[in-house]
């Protein structure tokens, strides 16, 4: 398979330094995005010819936002709009990390202290998945309301929209605030600016700053008195939020994000980012930082790989697979593979994926295990 060979040849050598790791991971992303986009487009064209005007949706690969560039020149393919919904596959590992997050949220249930936490790590290491698992945890649901998930990247964001205003609007929409209110707030800001200009009053505050201040005030009013949990997923510099969320001295600055989060009611804000410097600027102390590293456990990475294999097995074949395990994907089956040399295969997967769960899932899509006619499971020789 040409796509698989090209993909694997790019990441076949072992990484020797942190800089090489970063470069190699970037190559994994760009190569897979380009090749998978071609394959996916061809597949959709074939599907359209078979099913008329039907279109297929729901593919969660990182290629769905591959067009265009961000304001600072980084390709949008690096960002994906996320949601609070649990992934459609089993979540492997994260036992200690999940316990840490739950402890952060639940250790002092009656505490009224406002707290922030940043989860930082490489692309594809599982920051979003970890947060989704905790966000949907029943114990967490019982303590926090409202719970709001904010994907810092949104496909719906207009090119001329101020990134700060866009994020606050999306939080307010989650709280039930309608777009009509946003129009009213913007009109108010424009009218106030116009009146002061006509009166000859010198003012440095722009219309957008006035609009942002009003939106943050509206957010504050909607959250005051509530034990809220807010997740800001995939924060980049492009979002232009780099201010301490718990800095009470900044509460007087009307355009500061912390103004929108009432203090003293036990609210919590969790953010994820690939940028540790930015994360520290937002959450402050080292103790508010949780680093997520690539997997060192070959067994859990192997399980992630097997779960992602796009194998569909009929009833007869499933009968032959006595140790097959059903996944959340309905008719998909994740077989337990017992290769002749398991240690070698698992280490090979670890080397090729760099310990990154997303890379392991990508490899599973282009180099899956196969089920032969008699129900035995084997690996493709080219892997």
UniProtKB/Swiss-Prot annotation:
ATP binds at residues 121-128. Residues 36-84 are annotated as: Disordered. One of its GO terms (molecular function) is ATP binding. Residues 75-184, 207-281 form the NB-ARC domain. Residues 41-70 have a biased composition (Polar residues). One of its GO terms (biological process) is defense response. It holds the Pfam family NB-ARC. CDD domains: Ras_like_GTPase (cd00882). The keyword ATP-binding applies. It comes from the Eukaryota. InterPro entries: Disease_R_plants (IPR044974), NB-ARC (IPR002182), P-loop_NTPase (IPR027417). The keyword Cell membrane does not apply. Keywords: ATP-binding, Nucleotide-binding, Plant defense, Repeat. Possible disease resistance protein. This is Probable disease resistance protein At4g19060. It comes from Arabidopsis thaliana (Mouse-ear cress).
